[in-house]
Amino acid sequence: MTITHNLGFPRIGAQRELKRAVEAYWSGKKTAADLEETGRELRAAHWQRQAASGLQWVPVGDFAWYDHILEWTTLLGAVPARFGQPEGQPVSLDTLFRMGRGRAPSGTPTAACEMTKWFDTNYHYIVPELVPGQTFRIAREYLFEQVQEAQALGHQVKPVIPGPLTWLWQGKGDAYAGGASDAAKLQLLDTLLPVYAEVLARLARLGVEWVQIDEPILVLDLPQAWRDAFRTAYARLADAPVKLLVATYFGGLNDNLATALALPVAGLHVDLIRAPGQLQDVAAGLRPGQVLSAGIIDGRNIWRTDLDAALAALAPARQLLGERLWLAPSCSLLHVPVDLANETDLDAELRSWLSFAAQKLDELGLLGRALADARAPGVDEALAAQRAALRARRQSARIHNPAVGRRMAESNAVTRERAPFAERIARQQQLLKLPAFPTTTIGSFPQTAEIRALRRDWKSGALSDSAYEAAIRKEIESVIRFQEKIGLDVLVHGEPERNDMVEYFGELLAGFAFTRNGWVQSYGSRCVKPPIIFGDVARPAPMTVGWSSYAQSLTDKPVKGMLTGPVTILQWSFVRDDQPREQTCRQLALALRDEVVDLEQAGVRVIQIDEPAIREGLPLRRADWQAYLDWAVDCFRLSTAGVAADTQIHTHMCYSEFNDIIESIAAMDADVITIETSRSNMELLKAFEDFRYPNDIGPGVYDIHSPNVPDVDWMVGLMRKAAGRLPSERLWVNPDCGLKTRAWPETEAALVGMVEAARALRAG
C-alpha cells in the first residue's frame, strides 16, 4: 500500500461559488447564515472529491473565507488594535473581512492589513501585524468545527495549519524594522507556542492522528537565528499528542536540510517538482520510523504528469523506505483550477495534455497504485493512456512556429538601447507640457455589470461587431470626459474591452489557449483565469492600437497606450514546460515590441507596459536572482526600445517589495515607474535612501483594494514623505493599481481627492 494525501484543495468552488457567496454577503444580499451554508456545501464537495481519489486523509483547514493566513491570524487572536476587537471575545467573521479589505457588513471601516504575494506565486496573503509583547489565544473555533464537520461525513482528516516560524516570518510590524527575517520577532515564540500546543491537544481530543504544519520558509535563505528557532520551537511541540508532518514547498531544503531533518516530527514533506535532486539526501537522512512525503505531482502548473518518470525517480526511495514513502502534490492545489471536466470548450487534443486539481489527485492515486503494485488491475492501461497523451503533445505541430524560431535566432542583434533619460525627459516635457506632480491612473476603470454583459453578449454572438464597437467607443468617450472634467493630466481609455490584463492579450496572440472555468484565487474574492501558453508566441495583428488611437482622438491631453509586459504575461499564465521560461518570455517581448512601435506610429506618445509581477518571478534563493533579473530586464527593454526619445514609456508594479532589486528596476530604464506604496506607508521608498533612482516615479497614494475613500490630507502627507527622499520634479501622483474592481462612486470621490491633493502640492 502507498499512502497518498493532499496538502490543500482549491477553496473557490468549480463555478466560483465562494466568490459569489462572499460578495453577496458583503453587499447585503445574503446573510451570514447563507454564507456559512455555502461554505459547508463547498467543503463537503471538496472532501468527497478528494476521498474519491483514494486519499488516506482529506485536508481540513485549507478552506478560507478570504485567505488561509488571515484565518490563522484570527484564530490566534492577533487582531490589530484599530479593529476594536473586544478582549477575550471570539473574533467575528466581519472582523476578519475588515482586516482583509477594510470594511464588512458590520463594524467601523478602517485601513485594511497589508497584502502581499505568497512566496513566488500569484496568490496574495494578508500580512499578520505584530507588536512587541503580542498576546495570543484561541479566538476562533473554525478549525475544530471543520474537523468535526468532515468526521461527521465519514472522512479521515488531516488538519493543515501554518507553522509558527513561517507565520512569524511572514508577519510585519513597526517595531520589526529588519523585515521578514528580523530575529526580534522570534521573541514572540514564547507566547505563540503555547497556543500551538493547545491547538494540537484539542485536535488530538477530536481523534486526529496527523497534523500537517506548513513551514515553506525552510526553502528560503534562513539566518542562523531562524534555523536555531526551528529546533527550539519544535522541541517544545515534540510532546504534542498528534503526529506532525512538517510540509515544505516551492523549492529545495538545500542548506536547511540538516535543520529539517533534526526536527522531532513524525514526517517531512518536500517539493520534488521544484527540487527533484533533494529526494536521495532527504530519504537517507530520515530517522527510523519517520515518514517522507514526496511532492511528486506539480501543484502549480496544469500539464499532465510524466508518471513513468515519477515512478523511476521514486523507486530508490520506495526501496529504502517502503510504506514510509507517502505521495502528494508538490504544494497545495490552491494554485491550479478545480476540475478539467468543466472545460468542454477546449479542443480534445489540448485538453488531453492538461490536468487540473481533481485530475492531479487522480494522477496521484494512479501513481500510488503503480508504486505499490505495477501489476494491479487497470494500472498498466492507465499508464499507457498517460504515456500516449504525453507523446502526442511532444509531437504536435501546434507547438513550434518556424517564423518565431527565426526571429528568436536574430533577437540578440535587436537593440535594447534608448537615448539617455535626461535627453528623453526633456523632449517628452517639451511635447507633453505636464505640470508639477502630474496626475494619472494606472489604466483600468470600473468594470460595471453593463460592460461585462456587453463583452459576454459579443462573445456569444448575441451582439454584432459593429454594435459592440459602438458601445465600447461610447464607454471610452465617457471615461475620457470624466478624466478631463476632474482635471487628470495623463489620461487612459479605461480598458472596457478587457476582461483581464493578461487574458486579453493572450486571446490575440498565437500560442495561447483559454479555459471557461480555469479560475484560481488571487486574493480575497478575486479570481483570475490564467491563459495557457502551449506553443510559440507571435502577434498576428495589432491588439490595442484601434482603441488607444480612438481615445487619443477625443482629447488634446495625452492618453496612455496600455500593455501588459512580457514578464507579467509569463508569470500570470500557465506556461509550457518543454522549454526554458526565459525563451518563452523573449517570444512575448518581441510580440509586444511590435505593438509598442505600432502605437507610436498611430500617434500614442505615452505607452505603459505593466510589469506588476516582475518581483514575484524572483527565485526564492538569492543566489539565483541575478540570472533571472538579467533576462527579465532584457525582455522589458527588448519590448520598449523601438520607439523615439520623445515617446514616454511608463511601467507599473504593484505589491512589489523590490527595495533589494532596485538596481535592476532602474536598469529597465522606463521613463516613469508607478508603484504600490500606500498600504505599506511608502515603505518601498526606503530603497532611495541608498540608491538615487534616476527616472520619474509615481508612488501610489491610495489603496484601490479597499473601498474606503482616502483623505486628501493623508495623500498630501504621503507625497510629502516621498518628496523627502526624491526630487519633487520627478514625482507623479497616482493610485496604487488599476480601478477595475472598484465601483464608480468611490472611484470618482477618490480621484477627485487625488487631483485636489496634487493641486495642494503644486501650491506648496
Swiss-Prot record:
Could you say which residues bind L-homocysteine here? I442, G443, S444, E495, D610
Q: Which residues form the active site?
A: H705 (proton donor)
Q: Which residues bind L-methionine?
A: I442, G443, S444, E495, D610
The coenzyme or cofactor needed here is:
Zn(2+)
Q: Drop me one GO molecular function for this one.
A: 5-methyltetrahydropteroyltriglutamate-homocysteine S-methyltransferase activity
Keyword Amino-acid biosynthesis in the entry? The reply is yes
Q: State the name under which the record lists this protein.
A: 5-methyltetrahydropteroyltriglutamate--homocysteine methyltransferase
